[in-house]
Amino acid sequence: MLTFNFKKYDLNKEGSMLDVGCGEGRHIFGVMQEFPMMKCIGLDMDNDSLQKAEEGYAYFESISDAGAEFMKGSAYSLPFSDNTFDLIVCSEVLEHLHEYNDAVIEINRVLKPGGKFYASVPASW
C-alpha cells in the first residue's frame, strides 16, 4: 500500500525520484508503475530491507524505462549533488531520527528548485 497517490500531483514524469528510508521499495515500485520514465533511487540503512528491495526490483524492472537502484545511506548525509531530485519521498522515517530537522535540511539540499517533497509520519508523532 502506498502512502501517497502520486497520480494526483503535478510531477515531472521524466525526472528523478529519491525515497529516503525506502525499506523494501514500495514507493519506488509504485512510481515505476505510474511514471516509467522517472529514474528512481531508494536509500536505506537496513541491509535486509535493501536486499528485499533488490529482489522486488527484479519483478518490476520490466515496467520501467528509466530503472531504479537501491543503496545504503543515511538521511543525514545524502550522497548526491545539490538540486538533484524532482521528487523526494520520506515515509514513516522522520519519527525514527533523533535530529530529524538535520535530515530535512539535507533532503532540501538535494531537492531541485520547484521539486516536490512528500513526508508522512504517524499521527501520534
Predicted regions located by residue number:
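Conserved SAM-binding loop and adjacent beta-strand
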Residues: 1-3
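Conserved SAM-binding loop
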Residues: 6-9, 15-125
